[in-house]
Design a protein with these regions (language model features):
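Bacterial Sec-dependent N-terminal signal peptides
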Residues: 1-23
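Surface-exposed binding patches on compact interaction domains or structured appendages
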Residues: 52-81
Length: 130
């Protein structure tokens, strides 16, 4: 009886581990480096559905209004890829590190994506000669 219970619990734990790996991102963070103020930048994160069921993004939220995630509402079939486009508006000078939380219907824990960089003052433009 103890052996049966142990194997049952072990099987459940293993299945939760597999569930957490159903969606795999090619990268979890991206560094823009130095970017000019007031010039929005975008990075596209790619993921693969390794699960048996279609992966559906329930929501993607950024920690502030300066960062915007965009994604497809369509299910991603087994073995297929999809993307999440993250745009940062670069309005405030200085370093930044922003997180985007992605929740998939087929995965228990949300995925956290991070973008980082430094916003520097825009270079002055040369005035046209008159």
């Amino acid at each position: 009886m103890k052996k049966f219970l142990f194997l049952t619990v072990l099987g459940l734990v293993a299945s939760f581990g597999v569930m957490a790996q159903d969606v795999k991102f090619s990268e979890g963070s991206f560094k823009f480096g130095k970017i000019e103020q007031n010039k929005p930048v975008t990075h596209v994160f790619t993921f693969t559905n390794n699960g048996a069921k279609p992966a559906v993004i329930e929501f993607a939220t950024a920690e502030c209004g300066c960062t915007t995630p965009e994604y497809s509402k369509e299910p991603v079939l087994k073995g297929k890829n999809s993307t999440i486009k993250v745009t940062y508006n670069a309005a405030a000078l200085g370093t930044f590190s922003k997180r985007v939380t992605i929740k998939f219907a087929c995965v228990n824990d949300p995925v956290i994506l991070t973008i980082e960089g430094e916003v520097v003052a825009a270079k002055p433009t040369a005035k046209a000669s008159k």
